[in-house]
Amino acid sequence: MKSSIPITEVLPRAVGSLTFDENYNLLDTSGVAKVIEKSPIAEIIRKSNAELGRLGYSVYEDAQYIGHAFKKAGHFIVYFTPKNKNREGVVPPVGITN
């Protein structure tokens, strides 16, 4: 089993993104993230910084989207992919099974 999903597998399915600096200040939004930018994502990233530092990857899920957080060059980038109800054809993130 993979220890994480490579960013190259997430990007083709991404429908939005949020980018934060090292102080968790929002720098950029795109796609569906423009609607959800006021969500507690920055707080979630702050609380899970240890996991991001250890693995370089973390997953957040809500009713509609899966947020894939990556730490890159001092920034935190969250790519959102649609939640696939039956998850067929989707590689599940670490810790999430069908």
Curated annotation (Swiss-Prot):
Signal peptide: none annotated. It is found in: Cytoplasm. SUPFAM superfamilies: YNR034W-A-like (SSF160683). GO terms for cellular component: cytoplasm; cytosol. Pfam families: YNR034W-A-like. InterPro entries: YNR034W-A/EGO2 (IPR021591), YNR034W-A/EGO2_sf (IPR035098). Keywords: Cytoplasm. Its main location: cytoplasm. Present with 2820 molecules/cell in log phase SD medium. This is Uncharacterized protein YNR034W-A. It comes from Saccharomyces cerevisiae (strain ATCC 204508 / S288c).
